[in-house]
Every structure is written in C-alpha cells, then in structure tokens.
Amino acid sequence: LIELGLDYATQPIRTRTLDMEDPTFLALHPRGKIPILEDGGLEVSESPAIVTYLSETYGGDATQLIPNTPWARAKYFEWMSFISMELDATSLYVLRRHVDLHETYGEAPAANDTAREYFLRMIQSAVPALPSEGNFLLGNDFSGADILMISCLNFSDRYDFTLPSEITAYRERVSARPTYQAALEANNP
C-alpha cells in the first residue's frame, strides 16, 4: 500500500488469537486466514493475490509492481510462486506451526529440521536465478515479487538462518528503499 502511495487503515489481527475466531472476521474471511484486504466492497486474501490486485488496480507507470511484457510477467509469477510455495508454505510455515505455535500444533523436531534444510536449499537455489544486472528479482524494476521475498526473508530471521551473501546483499538493497523503511515503520510502530 505504501509502495503505491495509497491511503489505508489497518486492523491488526495476530495469528492464532481469539480475534481470528470473531464472527465478524470469519464473515469477512471464512477460511480465517490473514492478511485480507478490503477495497470498497471487495475482499482479497493471500499475499500474492493482494499484491497483484493492488498493482493492477492502482499501479501507474511509476508504481507498476507487475511487469507488462509476457516474459517479464512470467518471471514475476515464477518468483511469486517460488516464494509463496517453496520458501513460505513448505518451510517457514512448518517452522511457524511447530516452533512458534507448538502448543497448538504439537512439536515436530524432524519436520522442523527438514523444513530448515529445505529453506536453506531453496534460498541457495534462488542465487543463480538472481539477475546479473539490477538490484531486484526482475533486474532494474522493483516488483511485487520483491515485496513477498523481503517479507519471507524478514520472517526467516526468527529461525537464525545464515543466508547466502548474494541474498543478504539483495535484502540490503531492498531494505534501503525509502518506501520499505516507511512500510517497516508503519507495521512496527
């Protein structure tokens, strides 16, 4: 939202709290998942869908977060899928459930070890896919894929991963952007 210069209001809801069981929240999002975006009379959930919707609805030439050419657009969706499935769902979400939320989901040391190993293997596999020119996942143009990647990298901090130097350098470039700093401040007052 900050990246696109949009005004917005948030309603913080912490995961696996009573807020997520509130009938008003469940009426809005029956799956009981966060994040969810309300825009006018529309509701959109799941981070990749939210980023894509916002970019396609509000992105202009200077703030377009999704490329327009078929090849670049395919690479965008390739990164979005990789980040969502391989980094987040397959590894970080397992750790979140069985480390952070073990009281709810139970302890699973073998699953945790496998998830850690998988995350490291997948993040290492991302290194050769980084463009040789430019600061971002799609080269010179910052995109919605960078938003998802930096979110996953930030979330991975709680598990003390040692990231490849190329990923650390990428992260530093994205983190130095003024809109990133503004979003970080807005989300962590």
What residue spans do the PLM features occupy?
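GST-like domain detector, emphasizing the conserved glutathione-binding G-site
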Residues: I2-A110
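Conserved beta-strand edge residues that scaffold enzyme active sites
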Residues: T15-R16, Y170, N188
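Structured helix-beta-strand junction loops
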Residues: R31, D61, S132-E133, R177
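Active-site-flanking alpha-helical
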Residues: S55, C152-L153, L184
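GST-like fold's C-terminal all-alpha helical module
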Residues: W79, I83-A176
